Amino acid sequence: MSVQGIEGVLQQLQVTALQASGSAKTLPAEAGFASELKAAIGKISENQQTARTLAQNFELGVPGVGINDVMVNMQKSSVSLQLGIQVRNKLVAAYQDVMNMGV
């Protein structure tokens, strides 16, 4: 028997043992497209809030906040927003394509 065959059998035995002991990982109920989309929108919002806060701190003259940090965070926020808009546009186009399909 080859090493790969033994490793495959060993892996199957480990999975079976985990399932039998009841400690097998279960997927969260909300694992899917909706949760990923929600997380991405949350990240976009977080990027915008961070950039806004950093810009305000720079305007107020808070020590340790440089113009380069502000500009990088503003660009990061802008790029993530543009990406979100493009994803939304693709989703709308895909939805319209599905709705225009004949049955």
UniProtKB/Swiss-Prot annotation:
Q: Which cysteines are joined by disulfide bonds?
A: none
Keyword set for this entry?
Bacterial flagellum
Gene Ontology biological-process annotations: bacterial-type flagellum-dependent cell motility
| Major site of localization recorded for this protein | other
- Pfam families for this protein: FliE (PF02049)
From which residue to which does the signal peptide run?
none
The places in or outside the cell where this protein is found are: Bacterial flagellum basal body
Source organism superkingdom = Bacteria
Family according to the record: Belongs to the FliE family.
Name of this protein? Flagellar hook-basal body complex protein FliE
Q: What organism is recorded for this protein?
A: Yersinia enterocolitica serotype O:8 / biotype 1B (strain NCTC 13174 / 8081)
What gene name is given for the protein in this entry?
Answer: fliE
